[in-house]
Amino acid sequence: MAKLQIKLVRSVIGTTPNQKKNVEALGLRKREQVVVKEDNAQTRGMINKVSHLLEVTEIAE
């Protein structure tokens, strides 16, 4: 299964509480932090909710 590299490029200051929770659920706390997650429907849904704050790249295995 492919993986996604997710980077927080914008701050969560000024976003809604639900967006902040989504970013935290993805494992991101600080700007410029990078995490690697499995590419599945749940992760894609969370990314879609806060796509304006993130930079996402696919990692082929």
Swiss-Prot record:
Q: Which InterPro entries match?
A: Ribo_uL30_ferredoxin-like_sf, Ribosomal_uL30_bac-type, Ribosomal_uL30_ferredoxin-like
Task: Please name the Pfam families in this protein's record.
Answer: Ribosomal_L30 (PF00327)
Listed under GO cellular component are: cytosolic large ribosomal subunit
Q: Name one GO molecular function term.
A: structural constituent of ribosome
GO:BP terms for this protein? Answer: translation
Q: Which residues form a coiled coil?
A: none
Keyword annotations? Ribonucleoprotein, Ribosomal protein
**Oligomeric form and interacting partners:** Part of the 50S ribosomal subunit.
> Which family is this sequence assigned to?
Belongs to the universal ribosomal protein uL30 family.
- Identify the HAMAP family for this entry: Ribosomal_uL30_B
Name of the protein: Large ribosomal subunit protein uL30
Gene source species = Clostridioides difficile (strain 630)
